[in-house]
Amino acid sequence: MKSFMHSKAVIFSFTMAFFLILAACSGKNEADSKDTGWEQIKDKGKIVVATSGTLYPTSYHDTDSGSDKLTGYEVEVVREAAKRLGLKVEFKEMGIDGMLTAVNSGQVDAAANDIDVTKDREEKFAFSTPYKYSYGTAIVRKDDLSGIKTLKDLKGKKAAGAATTVYMEVARKYGAKEVIYDNATNEQYLKDVANGRTDVILNDYYLQTLALAAFPDLNITIHPDIKYMPNKQALVMKKSNAALQKKMNEALKEMSKDGSLTKLSKQFFNKADVSKKIDADVQDVDL
């Protein structure tokens, strides 16, 4: 009996030890999985970031200099933030509609392309501290404003854009016909409005203002009476990658404090400081 009891005690002790080891390993793996994104990036010394390369002035190729270098406000913000974290940046160019999928699948570590921070997206992704604040405007034909007076007049109008942007959500909400482009240039978007292939482009105020200035001969303008949806843009990362989010926020905080964000903004946005919140009378849109 004594031997039997002793055997049971040994088996019980072994079983408990086995489960304790399993629990410890499980806990370690859980902790590791939470940090694995940042640790892998740090070990490689490189962060992979999705961007379009076609969205002036936030992500574009500088053909004027003859170098065709990828640059722009967000491109340089990411480069500087990464530099402060001891990292190099590899940019992967793709259409905006594929960026969030690429982040979730792990194809890239982050995406930077004037991506709006929304409540719905915050439930699915991690965002950095915003580095750009703006609001929505509408590019229309100059001679007749494309027959649009208010957002309600979008019904039946042909709205140009990418399918997954918040601006296409606005167009959808007001009954516009969607004309979807895949990583098109500003020139293509603007010429299509001017020649009547489309009627309106809903997008960010700063981006539209600069895009318009680049093509002064086209029959297009920013609608004088339509200002809507105050918004903010940030770097988007996988929801589980809290460590990377924290590191990026630390770098961006430093850049805001020492004036680097303001300097980059003024360089790319015609001396405007997009890193500061806007004080303007802007219509809210509930999406």
Swiss-Prot record:
Domain of life: Bacteria
Any Pfam family matching the protein: SBP_bac_3
InterPro entries: SBP_3_CS, Solute-binding_3/MltF_N
Membrane topology: Lipid-anchor
Signal sequence, renumbered to the chain: 1-24
Lipid moiety-binding region (S-diacylglycerol cysteine): C25
Keyword Transferase attached: no
Principal location: membrane
Lipidation (N-palmitoyl cysteine): C25
Transmembrane segments: none
Keyword line: Cell membrane, Lipoprotein, Membrane, Palmitate, Signal, Transport
Location in or out of the cell: Cell membrane
Gene Ontology, cellular component aspect: plasma membrane
The protein's role, per its UniProt record: Probably part of a binding-protein-dependent transport system.
Family membership: Belongs to the bacterial solute-binding protein 3 family.
Name this polypeptide is given: Probable ABC transporter extracellular-binding protein YckB
Organism per entry: Bacillus subtilis (strain 168)
